[in-house]
């Protein structure tokens, strides 16, 4: 009985599965089968197409893209899933239009590694269905396209490709800036972070928020690059001991690289003198002054001195402390200066020391105990008991009495002066005020005013601007301008007219010895009738007999 050959056309979607020409040639040597019916001839290509596609569609599984790190190892995965017999598996690398065999696994002859890959390529296991290899010590030349190929019988070859990208892990370092950080100086490079020969170029960032970064990048022919980042700041002594951190990020790194740097700010000494509590008195012992200095670099010299240039006995300078060996006396009063020096300069501080009188102490007199005498039972001899009384108390009481007397005298004198001043002010204010009261009697208007309001009509007595006393003294004829014939003149119809705007114009009597338009009348006109006038603070004189609105 003859075998039926299954032809091998290419399957859609299975472009990476190929059949060798030798299998087709071998198939042509077989006996021809009987001629099938016409319906079978039409269905045969479809059945054969379905058979091949089901057998070879996606038979090799690989990772399309693999990232390798220079100098390290990488695994290239290749799993073969076919039902046919696998006669050989191999790895090839594409170089342009040609390929180079990397490694071969034959079920009968074993493993074989070609050329430059010897000693660097190993198959993961001995199974023909797993062609995964490990490539050791990755170099730049290992990047490119690799093909995993499987040879089956009788269907031929099947293959899939993967692309290897070689990354170079950067070499990271952190160094101190070239210049020292001096307090108050210009902007200075504090630290330099370098990520050298990375592929691709690394990314550098800084943590610290004390300054700003400045980066430069240099590229090389092997596609690597070096980045240098400088951290700049304005130095200040308060930033001493602060931490800044360089953070390097790169795809070849499993995690970010972080390098920290402690700022070392140099500054001149900051000096302060302590130890004086303000209660140094004559006779006090065990006191000292201490010179505190904060400097970077540390100070190498401390010197004590006095502002007046004197140096009393009993002063001992040891390191940064000035000891007062002897009990204090008034000679130790003065201004003490401490000068501290380091490589950046000299600073000083001073302290004013005042030695006061010793505090008042109470000394008890020795007392004699009372001893009863038993020599004679009838006459008991005793000594008077002396009560303890401090000697200094009498002086204190005397001083307090004198001080009390002096304070009383001074206080009494001040009180008398104060009372005198207040009395003078009161009298002065009273003299400046008016001498009397306004005329406050109830005013009874004339009978004619009770009948009809004539508030806008001037009365005859209101036209007299001066009292009778003034008129009698002057003895001048009164020139009364208000005449009957004058009021009757037709051109003077505005006089005493209520509806006229000029109704308030009032004629005045004329006196020869007085000037018209005087604002005030002198006091000599009121000698005989002084009580009728009132003098005000502003200097004006008001008559009691007048009514004012």
From Swiss-Prot:
Per the UniProt entry, what are the Gene Ontology biological process annotations, in alphabetical order? cochlea morphogenesis; establishment of protein localization to plasma membrane; fertilization; heterophilic cell-cell adhesion via plasma membrane cell adhesion molecules; homophilic cell adhesion via plasma membrane adhesion molecules; lens morphogenesis in camera-type eye; protein localization to cell junction; regulation of postsynapse assembly
Ranges where the Ig-like C2-type domain occurs: 170-258, 269-354
Topology relative to the membrane: Single-pass membrane protein; Single-pass type I membrane protein
**Where is this protein found?**
Cell membrane; Postsynaptic cell membrane; Cell junction, Adherens junction
Q: List the disulfide bonds.
A: 78-148, 193-246, 291-338
Tissue-level expression: Predominantly expressed in testis and placenta as well as in many cell lines, including epithelial cell lines.
Q: Which residues are glycosylated?
A: 73, 83, 125, 186, 222, 331
The domain of life for this entry's organism is Eukaryota
Q: Which residues form the Ig-like V-type domain?
A: 59-165
Q: Tell me the leader sequence span.
A: 1-57
Which regions face the Extracellular side of the membrane?
58-404
Q: What Pfam families would the database entry show? A: C2-set_2, V-set
Q: Name one GO molecular function term.
A: cell adhesion mediator activity
Q: Which UniProt keyword terms apply here? A: Cell adhesion, Cell junction, Cell membrane, Disulfide bond, Glycoprotein, Immunoglobulin domain, Membrane, Postsynaptic cell membrane, Repeat, Signal, Synapse, Transmembrane, Transmembrane helix
Keyword Glycoprotein assigned to the entry: answer is yes
Decide whether keyword Metal-binding is in the record.
no
What this chain does, per the entry, is described as: Cell adhesion molecule that promotes cell-cell adhesion through heterophilic trans-interactions with nectins-like or other nectins, such as trans-interaction with NECTIN2 at Sertoli-spermatid junctions. Trans-interaction with PVR induces activation of CDC42 and RAC small G proteins through common signaling molecules such as SRC and RAP1. Induces endocytosis-mediated down-regulation of PVR from the cell surface, resulting in reduction of cell movement and proliferation. Involved in axon guidance by promoting contacts between the commissural axons and the floor plate cells.
Q: Which family does it belong to?
A: Belongs to the nectin family.
Listed under subunit, the entry gives: Cis- and trans-homodimer. Can form trans-heterodimers with NECTIN1, NECTIN2, PVR, IGSF4B/Necl-1 and with IGSF4. Interaction between NECTIN1 and NECTIN3 on the pre- and postsynaptic sites, respectively, initiates the formation of puncta adherentia junctions between axons and dendrites. Interacts (via Cytoplasmic domain) with AFDN, providing a connection with the actin cytoskeleton. Binds with low affinity to TIGIT.
Q: What is this protein called?
A: Nectin-3
Q: Record the organism.
A: Homo sapiens (Human)
The major lineage groups are:
Eukaryota, Metazoa, Chordata, Craniata, Vertebrata
């Amino acid at each position: 009985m003859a075998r039926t050959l299954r032809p091998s056309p290419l399957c859609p979607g299975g472009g990476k599965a190929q059949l060798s020409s030798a299998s087709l040639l071998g198939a042509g040597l077989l006996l021809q089968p009987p001629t099938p019916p016409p319906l079978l001839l039409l269905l045969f290509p479809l059945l054969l197409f379905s058979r091949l596609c089901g057998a070879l569609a996606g038979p090799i599984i690989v990772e399309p893209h693999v990232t390798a790190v220079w100098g390290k190892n990488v695994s290239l995965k290749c799993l073969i899933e076919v039902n046919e017999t696998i006669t050989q598996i191999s790895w090839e690398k594409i170089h342009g239009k040609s390929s180079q065999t990397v490694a071969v696994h034959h079920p009968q002859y074993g493993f074989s590694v070609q050329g430059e890959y010897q000693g660097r390529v190993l198959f993961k296991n001995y199974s023909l269905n797993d062609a995964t290899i490990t490539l050791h010590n990755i170099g730049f030349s290992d990047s490119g396209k690799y093909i995993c190929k499987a040879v089956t019988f009788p269907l031929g070859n099947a293959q899939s490709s993967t692309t290897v990208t070689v990354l170079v892990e950067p070499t990271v370092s952190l160094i101190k800036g070239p210049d020292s950080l001096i307090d108050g100086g210009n902007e200075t490079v504090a630290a330099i972070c370098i990520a050298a020969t990375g592929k691709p170029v690394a990314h550098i960032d800084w943590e610290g928020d004390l300054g700003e970064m400045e980066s430069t990048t240099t590229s090389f022919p092997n596609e690597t690059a070096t980045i240098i980042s400088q951290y700049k700041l304005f130095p200040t002594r308060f930033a001493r001991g602060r931490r800044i951190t360089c953070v390097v990020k790169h795809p070849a790194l499993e995690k970010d690289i972080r390098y920290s740097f402690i700022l070392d700010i140099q500054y001149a000494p900051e000096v302060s003198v302590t130890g004086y509590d303000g209660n140094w008195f004559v006779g006090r012992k065990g006191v000292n002054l201490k010179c505190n200095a904060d400097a970077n670099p540390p100070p190498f010299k401390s010197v004590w001195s006095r502002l007046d240039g004197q140096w009393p006995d009993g002063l001992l300078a040891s390191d940064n402390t000035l000891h007062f060996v002897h009990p204090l006396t008034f000679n130790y009063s003065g201004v003490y200066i401490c000068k501290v020096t380091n490589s950046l300069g000299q600073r000083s501080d001073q302290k004013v020391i005042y030695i006061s009188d010793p505090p008042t102490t109470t000394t008890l007199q020795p007392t004699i105990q009372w001893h009863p005498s038993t020599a004679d039972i009838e006459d008991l001899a005793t000594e008077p008991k002396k009560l303890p009384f401090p000697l200094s108390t009498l002086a204190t009481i005397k001083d307090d009495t004198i001080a009390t007397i002096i304070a009383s005298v001074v206080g009494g004198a001040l009180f008398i002066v104060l009372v005198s001043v207040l009395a003078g002010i009161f009298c002065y204010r009273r003299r400046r005020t008016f001498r009397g009261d306004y005329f406050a009697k109830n005013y009874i208007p004339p009978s004619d005013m009770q009948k009809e309001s004539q508030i806008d009509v001037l009365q005859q007595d209101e036209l007299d601007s001066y009292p009778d006393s003034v008129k009698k003294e002057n003895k001048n004829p009164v020139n009364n301008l208000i005449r009957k014939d004058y009021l009757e003149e037709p051109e003077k119809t505005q006089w005493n007219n209520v509806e006229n705007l000029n109704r308030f114009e009032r004629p005045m009597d004329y006196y020869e010895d007085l000037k018209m338009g005087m604002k005030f009348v002198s006091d000599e006109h009121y000698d005989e009738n002084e009580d009728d006038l009132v003098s005000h603070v502003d200097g004006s004189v008001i008559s009691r007999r007048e009514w004012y609105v």
